[in-house]
Amino acid sequence: MGTVLIHVCCAPDLLTTIFHVRDAEFFFYNPNIQPLSEYEKRREAVDKVANHFSLNVRYGEYSTEEIRKWYTAVKDYKDLGEGSKRCERCISFLLERTAQEARKRGHESFSTTLLASPRKNLPMIENIGKTIEEKYGVKFFFKNFRKGGAYQEGVRLSKELGIYRQNYCGCVFSLLERREKHAEISRKRGHM
């Protein structure tokens, strides 16, 4: 595997990932996470995990310009739901930036903690990673980080350590979808 730079989406998935790969440099880059208060909660949770396990975490830029670049990448697909082309474009955006950082810092490969999430499509992520690998000449390290009980152990540890566990993917579109879903459930309960 050599040296690897692993994109970090959130602390719960980081906890799951480190059961498989701990000797790595981690990269928290997420201009997709909104609002700012949510980004700050997630960054603080990653800090807590990094400090607890002595992990090497770098932080990518979170600015209006980076958010604008991310929005440009996904805006044509904003009305599509979770797991759609919108997510594919978002993941591609995040992994491309990770590959650029990996190449700049001399890493042999790059990966993502998204591979730990039970809500993500692993073949889609692998395809995106391989495409970016060809573009930047940095290998994409693919591994199902959920395996071997790691996901369940990550959940247990996050509760034990008091790590923030988010309830939506991160982007404003997934937040709105979640709110709409909960409003619909509430309406149905109100009519029973």
From Swiss-Prot:
Cystine pairings recorded for this chain: 169-171
Domain of life the protein comes from: Bacteria
Broadest EC class assigned to this enzyme: oxidoreductase
UniProt record, GO biological process: queuosine biosynthetic process; tRNA modification
InterPro entries hit by this protein: QueH
Pfam families per UniProt: QueH
Annotated coiled-coil segments of the chain: none
Listed GO MF terms: 4 iron, 4 sulfur cluster binding; epoxyqueuosine reductase activity; metal ion binding
Pathway the protein contributes to: tRNA modification; tRNA-queuosine biosynthesis
Keyword tRNA processing: yes
Reactions accelerated catalytically: epoxyqueuosine(34) in tRNA + AH2 = queuosine(34) in tRNA + A + H2O
Keywords of the record: 4Fe-4S, Disulfide bond, Iron, Iron-sulfur, Metal-binding, Oxidoreductase, Queuosine biosynthesis, Redox-active center, tRNA processing
Binding site for [4Fe-4S] cluster: 9-10, 87, 90
EC number: 1.17.99.6
Family per record: Belongs to the QueH family.
Annotated function: Catalyzes the conversion of epoxyqueuosine (oQ) to queuosine (Q), which is a hypermodified base found in the wobble positions of tRNA(Asp), tRNA(Asn), tRNA(His) and tRNA(Tyr).
Protein name: Epoxyqueuosine reductase QueH
Source species of the chain: Thermotoga maritima (strain ATCC 43589 / DSM 3109 / JCM 10099 / NBRC 100826 / MSB8)
